[in-house]
Amino acid sequence: MSGQKPIYRRILLKLSGEALLGKEAYGIDSSVLDQIAEEVTAVHQMGVQVAIVIGGGNIFRGVSGASRGMDRSTADYMGMLATVMNALALQQALEKHGTSTRVQSAIDMKEVAEPYIRRRALRHMEKGRIVIFAAGTGLPFFTTDTTAALRAIEMGAEVLMKATKVDGIYASDPKKNPSALRYDRISFSEVLQKDLKVMDATAISLAKDQNMRIVVFNLRKKGNIKKIVLGKCIGTVVEGCDHAQ
């Protein structure tokens, strides 16, 4: 089904920190940030309620810090703080486009963000505000992908949209294998069994338990967010039933 009427009433968009890099080696590319804000605003103006979970890998990755000998918990907390920086930057970009936005942090820092309160987040969305969830789950050892699955379920989102650099889920790395099979649809069980690295196993398992549909798509192709919301076949859909390829 496709058309000009959204098929989703409420979505959760997962953005990696790396998505904000653009052509930069570190930090945030302001032109990329503005493009994301423009696309999200366009969807929001269609009456779709939007929540966002953002990573921090463009600034600091907890796993990378731990691999260099840092205590894993400390490294993960540093990564969570990086997500707050990204969330504030995205909030600023969205509000420049006239979109009222709130940041909720799983780590208390009342000077810059609201604490994460589920009912308040729901109320914000009902009032037409975008909500950005920062600081992951607030706990070490959990990825922002797992946070995205958790928040999507808590918010009652109808779909979790996972933004990536490629146009879906492949059987192998398309950069190393240009003829790699791309899935149009795949089940949660298949993703886990085939150990496909689109999201970590905890995130996929959580989505599977609650039958939270995931759409994996290429953020770099302008207009993809809107196309998915309108029901067009973009990227790879991950859902409950097994699909023959």
Curated annotation (Swiss-Prot):
Cited InterPro entries: AceGlu_kinase-like_sf (IPR036393), Asp/Glu/Uridylate_kinase (IPR001048), Uridylate_kinase (IPR011817), Uridylate_kinase_bac (IPR015963)
Compartments, record wording: Cytoplasm
Keywords: ATP-binding, Cytoplasm, Kinase, Nucleotide-binding, Pyrimidine biosynthesis, Transferase
GO cellular component, one term: cytoplasm
Pathway: Pyrimidine metabolism; CTP biosynthesis via de novo pathway; UDP from UMP (UMPK route): step 1/1
GO biological process, one term: 'de novo' CTP biosynthetic process
Binding residues for UMP: 56, 76, 137-144
Assigned protein family: Belongs to the UMP kinase family.
Gene Ontology molecular function terms on file: ATP binding; UMP kinase activity
Source organism of this protein record: Syntrophobacter fumaroxidans (strain DSM 10017 / MPOB)
Classification via CDD domains: AAK_UMPK-PyrH-Ec
Gene3D superfamilies: Acetylglutamate kinase-like
Residue positions binding ATP: 14-17, 57, 61, 164, 170, 173
Pfam families: AA_kinase
Catalytic reactions of this protein: UMP + ATP = UDP + ADP
Function recorded in the entry: Catalyzes the reversible phosphorylation of UMP to UDP.
Quaternary structure (record): Homohexamer.
Activation/inhibition comment: Inhibited by UTP.
Protein name, UniProt field: Uridylate kinase
Record bears the keyword Kinase: yes
EC number: 2.7.4.22
